[in-house]
Amino acid sequence: MRLALLWALGLLGAGSPLPSWPLPNIGGTEEQQAESEKAPREPLEPQVLQDDLPISLKKVLQTSLPEPLRIKLELDGDSHILELLQNRELVPGRPTLVWYQPDGTRVVSEGHTLENCCYQGRVRGYAGSWVSICTCSGLRGLVVLTPERSYTLEQGPGDLQGPPIISRIQDLHLPGHTCALSWRESVHTQKPPEHPLGQRHIRRRRDVVTETKTVELVIVADHSEAQKYRDFQHLLNRTLEVALLLDTFFRPLNVRVALVGLEAWTQRDLVEISPNPAVTLENFLHWRRAHLLPRLPHDSAQLVTGTSFSGPTVGMAIQNSICSPDFSGGVNMDHSTSILGVASSIAHELGHSLGLDHDLPGNSCPCPGPAPAKTCIMEASTDFLPGLNFSNCSRRALEKALLDGMGSCLFERLPSLPPMAAFCGNMFVEPGEQCDCGFLDDCVDPCCDSLTCQLRPGAQCASDGPCCQNCQLRPSGWQCRPTRGDCDLPEFCPGDSSQCPPDVSLGDGEPCAGGQAVCMHGRCASYAQQCQSLWGPGAQPAAPLCLQTANTRGNAFGSCGRNPSGSYVSCTPRDAICGQLQCQTGRTQPLLGSIRDLLWETIDVNGTELNCSWVHLDLGSDVAQPLLTLPGTACGPGLVCIDHRCQRVDLLGAQECRSKCHGHGVCDSNRHCYCEEGWAPPDCTTQLKATSSLTTGLLLSLLVLLVLVMLGASYWYRARLHQRLCQLKGPTCQYRAAQSGPSERPGPPQRALLARGTKQASALSFPAPPSRPLPPDPVSKRLQAELADRPNPPTRPLPADPVVRSPKSQGPAKPPPPRKPLPADPQGRCPSGDLPGPGAGIPPLVVPSRPAPPPPTVSSLYL
């Protein structure tokens, strides 16, 4: 077997062998299709650098596929080095491959171990560059140096071993094409909001916009597509190359694409493939729901057909349908041998499923791209250049859809492709590694050592998930993903991982919006909310009779949608509310599209005239559907809209599922009980005895407060007790109140004042007795006599003069006698003996707490 076949996923380990018989070629060969896309190309022999030594790429592929790969490539005469790493998230775990034998028997090859042959990376020396290349069958992919310099790499027709054919994207002349949305559009997108990204007044603990999402993708190749390739191996190679570009396109939006399965209708088509894309989409979605989804769980399925659709349409999908079991899919025409053209078309349809609308014309949705015709992936039509990037409008639309509750199935982390050998720096945590943040130049994780792929000292986790903060695991129960609407449920950290658990929502049929709707696929929208999303704040549902009259007519102003042939379908009176949206008031112009026609009509209701107005919205030439009511909208007591028909809500099984929760919980999207606080899963029958952390915190706070109050009361009681004891003991009390500063030394005691002041002093303070003799009084007695207030005249005779003591027993030295006689006793003193007021400038008298010193030798101070 040729070398290319050995490596073009030769690549397969365990599992059933892939079909290798030649397939009849009824759709035209790759060589024939390439004739219509001729453009200036240049062959080139790439080289692989190992230890800075150039080795032939062909020689490297004969041995093994290294995980880090450096390729030396010449572009426009200049040598460039591509620094690449294997994309290990492209094929998670073991994908499912399906094909059919000649007798119609389906062959399912599960558990294949694919050797990873797809790489992503950058060009050395070019900031903002990116590379997406597969080596499954030669060297194929895309190299973007700058927005103005982008190249595609393709293998020549029939030559899988030769050098790749390199073309500038500007030299690719693809046929003009457009996209048509199906009439079953399930959400109403808006024009870009005026506020820039990141300025919404919504606080999130972990922004769902920045959290990585993963789309589990299944690609189905119809019979005409399968006939273009010699065997299943070649078809698988091309599918991997397309899926790699899809992942590259969506990666800047924090959305990863993982190929979980490939099915090829190798013998015949399993549904009718019509030139009308609406018919093909309708048939494919019915087959997906009934046959594909039960045996191969996934988020989105994309049909690739070799049949040409009528007109310029190359694809069709349903707006905002991701995660829906009924509508999450699209159909795509393989209109080019270039993988870039096909991948860009599939990315466009997958973008519609994610809630992305067509970009507005003009410069309102800027997008970097090759000059002069800078095109974005979500443009309604591209005449020449395929889009390589999503515009700012697409980013805002995805943000709005996520915050509205879309995409609950996208938050599940999938197992990556098993590694051939652990390699530190590939950004995948492998056996023996605690973390992997890439090479030294790329690593921005402060918790991870990029040289050893081990956590730094003291770190518990790598900061690659919302449950890790400052290199420490968040506690179990910390909310890592808040609710995003009435039908969403919060997620909490497990306590032993940095990753947030998969997103779950309320189960289908659980009531929301105050009973005006029920949850469907994790979303809730009442009729009023849908009107406001189309006509702005203040819009309300039209009068019931106006609504019923319009939708039962089945025309452009009102219907229950279109059938695959394009004609309008009238609603029955019972189903009228589940048909086209009929609103009143609000804006004069809708937020989506424009008014093509306006119809006014007066209806007689039991003799009363009712004025009704209906509009025919122009949503663009490539969008051929009215805006219909969302599934889950209430249409009567116990009735909701399902498949645009008013049906009983119990068909959704919510009540049956809720009965398993025994009245203490509700059902989630996995049909499990989400128990109320205080009740334990799985059936909410066991009441938790442990108090919550909040209750525990409150009890501890009250206990601390009680201890502080008791300590304060004890201190106050002790102080009062001491004061009472001092009052009882009098001058001998050993306790005194705190003083702000040293007390002034009092003058000599006056007998009259001493008798009168003792009572006053006892009420003021009680200084402690001195522990040693006091020093001599530094203030002269003459000055004391001048400053002291005169006492009242004595009321009884003075005592006899004291006996003069010897000098040894005398106290302080006798002060000099006054120079002049003291004044006579003043008249008119206050008989009460009160001290002068503060205006006299005389300090108040302080009575000493120690015994008075011996009196002077004179018998009176007034002599």
UniProtKB/Swiss-Prot annotation:
- Which stretches are tagged as biased composition: Basic and acidic residues? 35-44, 779-789
**What EC number(s) would the UniProt record show?**
3.4.24.-
Q: Where is the active site?
A: E349
Q: Where are the transmembrane segments?
A: 697-717
| Ranges where the record places region Disordered | 22-45, 736-863
What does the record say about tissue specificity? Expressed in colon and small intestine. Expressed in airway smooth muscle and glomerular mesangial cells (at protein level). Ubiquitously expressed. Overexpressed in atherosclerotic lesions. Constitutively expressed in cultured endothelium and smooth muscle. Expressed in chondrocytes. Expressed in airway smooth muscle and glomerular mesangial cells.
Signal peptide positions are 1-17
Disulfide pairs here are C323-C409, C365-C393, C367-C376, C480-C500, C657-C667, C661-C673, C675-C684
Among its keywords, does the record have NAD?
A: no
User: Motif Cell attachment site residues?
Assistant: 484-486
The primary location reported for this protein is membrane
SUPFAM superfamilies linked to this entry: Blood coagulation inhibitor (disintegrin), Metalloproteases ('zincins'), catalytic domain
Motif SH3-binding covers 815-821, 850-856
Top-rank EC class of the record's enzyme? hydrolase
EGF-like domain residues are 657-685
**UniProt motif Cysteine switch: location:** 177-184
UniProt's post-translational modification comment states: The precursor is cleaved by a furin endopeptidase. Phosphorylation increases association with PTKs.
Activity regulation (record text): Inhibited by hydroxamate-type metalloproteinase inhibitors such as marimastat. Inhibited by metalloproteinase inhibitor 2 (TIMP-2) and TIMP-3 at nanomolar concentrations. Not significantly inhibited by TIMP-1 at concentrations of up to 100 nM. Not activated by PMA or ionomycin.
GO MF annotation list: immunoglobulin receptor binding; integrin binding; metal ion binding; metalloendopeptidase activity; metallopeptidase activity; SH3 domain binding
Q: Which residues lie on this side of the membrane: Cytoplasmic?
A: 718-863
Q: Where in the cell is it found?
A: Endomembrane system; Cell junction, Adherens junction; Cell projection, Cilium, Flagellum; Cytoplasmic vesicle, Secretory vesicle, Acrosome
Q: Which residues carry this modification: Phosphotyrosine?
A: Y715, Y735
Q: What is known of its domains?
A: The cytoplasmic domain is required for SH3GL2- and SNX9-binding.
Supply the PANTHER family for this chain.
Answer: ADAM A DISINTEGRIN AND METALLOPROTEASE DOMAIN, DISINTEGRIN AND METALLOPROTEINASE DOMAIN-CONTAINING PROTEIN 15
Q: Describe the task this protein carries out.
A: Active metalloproteinase with gelatinolytic and collagenolytic activity. Plays a role in the wound healing process. Mediates both heterotypic intraepithelial cell/T-cell interactions and homotypic T-cell aggregation. Inhibits beta-1 integrin-mediated cell adhesion and migration of airway smooth muscle cells. Suppresses cell motility on or towards fibronectin possibly by driving alpha-v/beta-1 integrin (ITAGV-ITGB1) cell surface expression via ERK1/2 inactivation. Cleaves E-cadherin in response to growth factor deprivation. Plays a role in glomerular cell migration.
Q: What is this protein called?
A: Disintegrin and metalloproteinase domain-containing protein 15
